[in-house]
């Protein structure tokens, strides 16, 4: 025989409090969900280059002597400094790694943020680098072995 569900419902201990659903809704009304964890924060620039009416992505090959991820193909980027925004970080790292001044980079938009299993939060920015800037690239020898373009 089925039990009456309402009769079978018991109040938990301490259920005499006055907390209401409205109270909970008020607490969460302005809350923005975020990532849980102890993250290290990084930013990258996903650089587009318009060259001879074609569009390219610019990639780096990380220096083989790097402690982490040597020889990997990546975008310019690195760890966030405490005094900068994530966008400023992406632009600073592009300058440090391949010598393109931030004044020459036009940021189009922020892309999705990637949260990794190893507690990295990677902020990504899509930007445009003028073709003329490619003539003046200066690699950080400690970080970059080469750069190359891939047509889209």
Region roles according to the model:
Residues 34-75:
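N-terminal strand-loop-strand
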Residues 20, 63-72, 88-94:
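Short N-terminal helix-initiation segments at or just after the protein's N-terminus
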Residues 29-33, 56-57, 62-63, 82, ...:
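Short secondary-structure boundary micro-motifs
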Residues 1-36:
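Entry/capping segment at the start of metal-dependent catalytic domains
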Residues 12-17, 26-30, 41-46, 75-78, ...:
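A generic short-segment signal for beta-strand/edge and adjacent turn/coil regions
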Residues 79-152:
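Unchanged
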